[in-house]
Amino acid sequence: MDVSIRDDGGNFNYRVCAVMTDHDKILAMRDKRSPFYYLPGGRVMIGETAEQAVIREVEEELDITPEIIRPLWLNQSFYTDDVDGMDYHQLCIYFLMDITDTDLLSKGSRFSLREGHHRHDFEWLPFERLKDEYFYPLFLKKEIYNLPSAFTIRTERE
């Protein structure tokens, strides 16, 4: 069961995301349900650590098993979703991942994979293109250039 709560006042999610980079590009994804780019990842399950969750999500979405280098951010975000129009309070831990010992780069600059009944479209986006793309999280458009050396807590309100 995912750590996710819904009530009349909005939604709460506890999520993880994988930051995977190669030569000033970041791996982003989207699907037909979401018009914007986002990072691979998903909700943490009850009883699961954030580290276990990010590995599980990347395995499910990309069929690879990367290594975690380190956590980068805990981002507290408050927003209204562009797709469902609902209010969200979300905690997301972003992990920098090592993809060296995977076949991820051999998949090409754009590729699609299926996860169950869902098709995910992936693309290696150049850092400088992020500012012009419909991409979440917004803070990453600037902070991708200077990843924190220590775990950082941040808050984002839209």
Where does each model-flagged region fall?
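Active-site-adjacent beta-strand/loop module that shapes the phosphate/pyrophosphate-binding cleft
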Residues: Y79-K107, E143
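Conserved Nudix-box catalytic region and its N-terminal flanking loop in Nudix hydrolases
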Residues: D22-E60
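A generic structural micro-feature
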Residues: D8-F12, G85-L91, R114-R119
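Short, P/G- and charge-enriched loop/turn segments at secondary-structure junctions
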Residues: M1-D8, D81-G85, R110-S112
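Acidic, metal-coordinating catalytic segment for phosphate/diphosphate chemistry
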Residues: M1-V19, H23
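A short coil-to-beta-strand element that immediately follows conserved catalytic motifs
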Residues: T65-L74
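Nudix hydrolase/Nudix homology domain
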Residues: P35-Y37, D103-E158
